[in-house]
Amino acid sequence: MLSHPELWAFATHWYRLLDVHAPLESFRPLLSEDVQLVFPESTVTGFEGYGDWYNRVVAIFFDEQHTLKVADITSDNGDSWSAHVVVNWKASIWNPPASSSTRLMMDADQTWDLKRDSSGALVVSRYVVNGMTYEPGSCKL
């Protein structure tokens, strides 16, 4: 069983780790071994693929702030679940040799597939960014 409060807490924790640029290993217990992550710029599989993606993005974005807006269970198969997630993401980007950074501000619409690992912990097995809605004044990816 997966409850809405558990999903909300899991997603909030996930985004907090992204905000603080937590050590990569902090994400290992949150991802299934065969995880697939579909981002606008690439699709990655496994923890190694996630690690490559993560190390790239933490070198690009700073002053990140993720605010969870929606985390709804959309499918319950007993031992696996799908969730609709919407997060408001704000981040700064500096592209050398620009004299200043730019600010990214958007809602990211996502679908997460989740299951329990062998210890019973909740993990993401598939993570898809469905689309992004930019706020007025935001730079674009």
Regions found by a protein language model. Give the residues of each.
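Short, low-complexity N-terminal intrinsically disordered segments enriched in polar/charged residues
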Residues: 1-33, 37
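A broad structural signal for short, well-ordered beta-strand segments within beta-sheet-rich domains
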Residues: 6, 61-63, 68-70, 98, ...
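A solvent-exposed, acidic/Ser-Thr-rich amphipathic alpha-helical stretch
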Residues: 24, 28-77, 81
